[in-house]
Amino acid sequence: MARFVVLVLLGLLYLSHLDAVQHSPKVQVYSRHPAENGKPNFLNCYVSGFHPPQIDITLMKNGKKMEAEQTDLSFNRDWTFYLLVHTEFTPTVEDEYSCQVNHTTLSEPKVVKWDRDM
């Protein structure tokens, strides 16, 4: 019985340690197809390698929030998380697209601009 209690306590200690480990998110912004002005496309913001799982991801057009869909939260073998936020868009020369990420590991929101040449 004492061995069981010790194992449970060690398990709880391990689980509490998982929350203490923090990893900053890696942000990638890209389109599904090569960019062509005036041609519909999909804009993706892939955020990976972060912990804890609470995160806010916003796709933006000229600094304003775009309506977007988000995949379910998933995790890697190392218990860091990843998400994909995506939306349809039609690129133009004048418009600037970006992805803004808020996470507890960041002192300020991380903004990554879409590079149409990628």
From Swiss-Prot:
Main location: secreted
Any one cellular-component term (Gene Ontology): late endosome membrane
Keyword Cell membrane: no
UniProt keyword Metal-binding present: no
Protein's cellular compartments: Secreted
Any one Gene Ontology molecular-function term assigned to this protein's record: MHC class II protein complex binding
Alphabetical GO biological process terms: antigen processing and presentation of exogenous peptide antigen via MHC class II; antigen processing and presentation of peptide antigen via MHC class I; immune response; peptide antigen assembly with MHC class II protein complex; positive regulation of immune response; positive regulation of T cell activation
Cystines in this chain: C45-C99
Signal peptide: 1-20
CDD domains: IgC1_beta2m (cd05770)
Domain Ig-like C1-type: 25-113
InterPro entries recorded: B2Microglobulin (IPR015707), Ig-like_dom (IPR007110), Ig-like_dom_sf (IPR036179), Ig-like_fold (IPR013783), Ig/MHC_CS (IPR003006), Ig_C1-set (IPR003597), MHC/Immunoglobulin (IPR050160)
Domain of life (superkingdom): Eukaryota
PROSITE patterns membership: IG_LIKE, IG_MHC
Listed Gene3D superfamilies: Immunoglobulins (2.60.40.10)
Alphabetic keyword roster: Disulfide bond, Immunity, Immunoglobulin domain, MHC I, Secreted, Signal
Assembly description: Heterodimer of an alpha chain and a beta chain. Beta-2-microglobulin is the beta-chain of major histocompatibility complex class I molecules.
Family: Belongs to the beta-2-microglobulin family.
Known role: Component of the class I major histocompatibility complex (MHC). Involved in the presentation of peptide antigens to the immune system.
Record-given protein name: Beta-2-microglobulin
Source species of the chain: Felis catus (Cat)
